[in-house]
């Protein structure tokens, strides 16, 4: 990973460039004109899509990226160039073709659900003159690149003539070509270093129903032979990545939580291209891509991932289960954002949990039942001392957090230094705030930031104080 972090590969992306346009709003009415929903738009966002998302991923990893493709002489084309320049991408080799529409996909989203998509684009093959310009530019600048990525979304840019021209030029100059393919005819990519279809795409292209390791191997071999590849590769979603060079190897997925698989394929080809350019083997590159995909599917939408995020993620995989669920303020803020964006209901409670007992466990189980994710705020040692006296806590915060995080009902534990979790609740803004039944009729800190307050009765006769008394022999039962 250190070598990858210190290396800046120069990568050219050629393919279908597009804009992903999102319109966010609320839908609470039906139109009087027709039986359709009315969406009141409150926010609009635009990001790079298609091959542009591969570019985004490469830039996030730290690559120096150039882009080649064809756009129209239109407003969307101007916007796309602006988005690329904003992330410091070389756009000198993008061709503007008269009469062609720049691809823009607009999605209307309400209540976290996509309810409509409309597209503006051209799908016909690009002109002969556009192909010549791209190939001439590649031949002139080939020494500037460590690898070339072809990102095919079947929008007419990556014709067979262009693909074969690119692969031929790169082959003569010792440059590897990696392809994210589309369609069932992989012959147009013949001679590439590798392709990265997903399982569904591989089945479509090879006509082999991949249902076990033997059929997977057959599909990999057929791809390798039919497209004259150095290496064949198939992404297997939650099962990881399979490759075939001289034998089949499967690298299992390492994703801990999956929020959204949108754009995961772009992350895979970008990370493999990045690692291959740094001189890594295909095995090392596949493992790196798996880690990158494991991070990106934990985000919402066509997201990207950095080397630092991958390093942190890899380190977290080696932590114990409990350690991985103990978070700081910044970490939990990002985690809560992802859960809420995916429509999950967040529950929060807090306490000292000094000597964990059955009353605590049952309380936390009930709290978890109010939503999808339970976050427990944990008073620090100094906070417990201020609240409970100089003899407390019995167990230090590190031990208390570890025990809580090991409980099935608890998703995350967040230690805090203040006497109350006010700032933590303010940041999280839980759907449900849970407190003990002894708060009946009392003011509860942070209720103004929660959608609802739930009071849960304690288990009779179970408390940390009584446990301590019993240990001391002061309580006879």
UniProtKB/Swiss-Prot annotation:
What does the function comment of this entry state? Answer: Catalyzes the ADP transfer from ATP to D-glycero-beta-D-manno-heptose 1-phosphate, yielding ADP-D-glycero-beta-D-manno-heptose.
Pathway participation: Nucleotide-sugar biosynthesis; ADP-L-glycero-beta-D-manno-heptose biosynthesis; ADP-L-glycero-beta-D-manno-heptose from D-glycero-beta-D-manno-heptose 7-phosphate: step 1/4; Nucleotide-sugar biosynthesis; ADP-L-glycero-beta-D-manno-heptose biosynthesis; ADP-L-glycero-beta-D-manno-heptose from D-glycero-beta-D-manno-heptose 7-phosphate: step 3/4
Q: Which NCBIfam families match?
A: cyt_tran_rel (TIGR00125), rfaE_dom_I (TIGR02198), rfaE_dom_II (TIGR02199)
What is the protein name for this chain? Bifunctional protein HldE
In the record, what lineage is assigned to the organism producing the protein?
A: Bacteria, Pseudomonadati, Campylobacterota, Epsilonproteobacteria, Campylobacterales
Q: Which InterPro entries match?
A: Bifunc_HldE, Cyt_trans-like, PfkB_dom, RfaE_dom_I, RfaE_dom_II, Ribokinase-like, Rossmann-like_a/b/a_fold
Query: Which residues are annotated as active site?
Result: 266
User: Which Pfam families does this entry report, sorted A to Z?
Assistant: CTP_transf_like, PfkB
Region labeled Ribokinase — which residues?
1-321
The answer to whether the entry has keyword Amino-acid biosynthesis is: no
GO cellular component terms given for this protein: cytosol
Which organism is this entry from? Sulfurimonas denitrificans (strain ATCC 33889 / DSM 1251)
């Amino acid at each position: 990973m250190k070598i990858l972090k210190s290396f800046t590969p120069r990568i050219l992306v050629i393919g279908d460039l597009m804009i992903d346009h999102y319109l966010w709003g609320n839908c609470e009415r039906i139109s009087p004109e027709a039986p359709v929903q009315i969406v009141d738009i409150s926010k609009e966002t635009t990001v790079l899509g298609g091959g542009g998302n591969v570019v985004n991923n490469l830039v996030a990893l730290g690559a120096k990226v150039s882009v080649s493709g064809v756009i129209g002489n239109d407003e969307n084309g101007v916007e796309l160039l602006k988005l690329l320049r904003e992330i410091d991408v070389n756009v000198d080799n993008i061709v503007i073709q008269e009469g062609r529409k720049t691809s823009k996909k607009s999605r209307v989203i309400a209540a976290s659900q996509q309810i409509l998509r409309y597209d503006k684009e051209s799908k016909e093959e690009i002109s002969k003159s556009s192909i010549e310009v791209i190939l001439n530019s590649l031949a002139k600048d080939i020494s500037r690149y460590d690898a070339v990525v072809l990102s095919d979304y079947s929008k007419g840019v990556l014709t067979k003539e262009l693909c074969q021209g690119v692969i031929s030029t790169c082959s003569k100059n010792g440059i590897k070509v990696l392809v994210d393919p589309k369609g069932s005819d992989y012959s147009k990519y013949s001679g590439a270093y590798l392709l990265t279809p997903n399982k569904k795409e591989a089945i479509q292209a090879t006509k082999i129903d991949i249902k076990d390791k033997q059929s997977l191997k057959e599909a990999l071999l057929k791809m390798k032979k039919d497209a004259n590849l150095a290496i064949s590769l198939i992404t297997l979603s939650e099962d990881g990545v399979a490759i075939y060079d001289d034998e089949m190897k499967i690298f299992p997925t390492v994703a801990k939580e999956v929020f959204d698989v949108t754009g995961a394929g772009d992350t895979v080809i970008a990370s493999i291209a990045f690692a291959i350019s740094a001189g890594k083997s295909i095995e090392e590159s596949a493992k790196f891509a798996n880690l990158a995909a494991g991070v990106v599917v934990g985000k919402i939408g066509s997201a990207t991932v950095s080397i630092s995020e991958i390093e942190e993620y890899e380190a977290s995989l080696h932590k114990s289960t409990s350690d991985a669920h103990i978070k700081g303020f910044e970490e939990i803020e990002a985690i809560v954002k992802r859960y809420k964006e995916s429509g999950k209901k967040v529950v929060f409670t807090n306490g000292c949990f000094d000597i964990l007992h059955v009353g605590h466990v049952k309380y936390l189980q009930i709290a978890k039942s109010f939503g999808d994710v339970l976050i427990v705020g944990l008073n620090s040692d100094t906070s417990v001392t201020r609240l409970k006296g100089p003899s407390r806590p019995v167990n230090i915060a590190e031990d208390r957090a570890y025990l809580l995080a090991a409980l099935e009902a608890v998703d995350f534990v967040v230690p805090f230094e203040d006497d109350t979790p006010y700032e933590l609740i303010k940041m999280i803004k839980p759907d449900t705030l849970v407190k003990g039944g002894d708060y009946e009729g009392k003011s509860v800190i942070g209720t103004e930031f929660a959608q609802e307050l739930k009071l849960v009765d304690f288990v009779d006769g179970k408390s940390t104080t009584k446990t301590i008394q019993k240990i001391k022999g002061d309580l006879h039962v």
